């Protein structure tokens, strides 16, 4: 449908759209929750075969660490898709981790830009590695580490399935 819409407006260079609304399988209008606009942007970018998707935020979370704890932290200049996804799942809140997949699958770089510091140039997320050993530090509160050890009476796949069954029962990840 997007290609049909664009074909009707060939002379238009810029399209503005919302990012939080969608339709579900029942054709009902739904709200995508926080970060849904990031996902919409990369899905639209993939559909259009964009050269790059820019995500703007007013958050200063594009730093190497939390500015509430470290004075004047440096900006993260470049991350691979895998690094960005791991940081997001571990508490780095500069963007929605679900926006990575459409960009990664279509090899479309994502540029995170901070509206509070537009001159900084932002953070480029792509398939490329920068060679730096440490990119950023992030943390989440109330995380628990659980170590499982099998007594070998169950086959490994049965053991693991019982663990995940327990997580599912309590809606935990």
Predicted regions and their residues:
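C-terminal catalytic "cap/lid" subdomain
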Residues: 1-173
């Amino acid at each position: 449908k997007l290609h049909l819409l664009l074909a009707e407006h060939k002379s238009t260079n810029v399209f503005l759209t919302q990012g939080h609304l969608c339709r579900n399988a029942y054709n009902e209008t739904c709200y995508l929750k926080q970060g849904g606009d990031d996902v919409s942007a990369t899905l639209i970018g993939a559909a259009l075969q964009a050269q790059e998707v820019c995500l703007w935020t007013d958050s200063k979370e594009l730093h190497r660490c939390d500015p509430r704890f470290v004075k004047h932290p440096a900006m993260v200049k470049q991350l691979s898709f895998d690094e960005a996804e791991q940081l997001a799942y571990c508490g780095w809140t500069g963007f929605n981790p679900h926006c990575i997949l459409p960009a990664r699958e279509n090899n479309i770089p994502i540029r995170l830009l901070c509206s509070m510091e537009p001159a900084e140039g932002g953070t480029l997320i792509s398939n490329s590695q920068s060679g730096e050993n440490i990119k950023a530090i992030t943390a989440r509160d109330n995380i628990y580490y659980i170590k499982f050890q099998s007594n070998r009476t169950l086959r490994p796949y049965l053991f693991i399935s019982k663990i995940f069954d327990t997580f599912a029962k309590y809606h935990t990840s």
